[in-house]
Amino acid sequence: MRDFPFLRASADTVFDGVVGMLSVDELRELERMVATAATEELMSRFLRVEASHKADGSLITEADLEMQARLLRELARRWPAYAVLGEEMGAAEQEALMRGSDSGLWVLDPLDGTANFASGIPFFGVSIALMGDGRVQGGVVYDPVRRESFSALRGGGAWLNGETLVIDGPAPALRGAMGMVDLKRLPAELVQRFATRSPYRSQRSFGSVALDWCWLASERVQVYLHGGQKLWDYAAGSLVLAEAGGNGGLFEDYAGTRVEQLVLQPKIAIAATSTTLFEEWSGWLTAAMQGRG
């Protein structure tokens, strides 16, 4: 696990069958809970639901609300000691929950990729992470369309459908990499640079941040950039990437100022499948923002 400050194990952490605040068995139980709920609450409504707009202009559907309500109930019944912060809660409630997060807090995005879901595009997922002591302790990202369950425990590894997930393929140079880049949240000068002088082989953007991280962890893409992710977007997926051996994280700017603690405010995500590739990728971004790329 590399270069994710808020995911690192404390010096006094002891792993003895239980990794952090969740055991492997509990993680598998969480995966089953999420998969069952996603099948019943999301897939049953896919292609059959209408969307409305929230105050910030983003979309929301009945599926978002029903999935969140169900997981709130099930998490409270199974792990009553941990509160739940959901994307569809109000800002004041979210801030209050963050203030008490050190003792354990679930961070939930019940439907990541709502615009895709509402448009009939089969690329969306569920993201849930357990925070404690200022770090992500464990997480699950579930893709109900492909039935892929990505999971990770801090200091314990990452898995895809229960099989160990490790980045072990040869990393290409940046020019040969496939990029996952969300252009709409980037500064205009950076978008212009991508349009006129892109540094990679090709680029995609699929519309589900949590799955973006996991596709990077499974080496389907090799470099990643997103200009504004919130806590529920990246908490679980970034842990999957870190535990799989990827490199990168959350940043305050394009000059490499790393985010050192989990917060609700949007942050820049920059990552890659290897240290060498990450250094080349982040270096190109810094140079591009300075007009040198």
Where is each model-derived feature located?
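Oxyanion/phosphate-interacting regions
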Residues: 2-32, 194-197, 214-293
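Acidic beta-strand-loop-alpha-helix segment within the catalytic core
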Residues: 128-214, 220, 260-293
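Residue-level signal for inorganic ion chemistry
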Residues: 42, 64, 75, 114, ...
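Glycine-rich active-site/cofactor-binding loop and its immediate structural neighborhood
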Residues: 104-141
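N-terminal subdomain of lithium-sensitive/metallo-dependent phosphomonoesterases centered on the IMPase/IPPase/PAP
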Residues: 2-111, 290-293
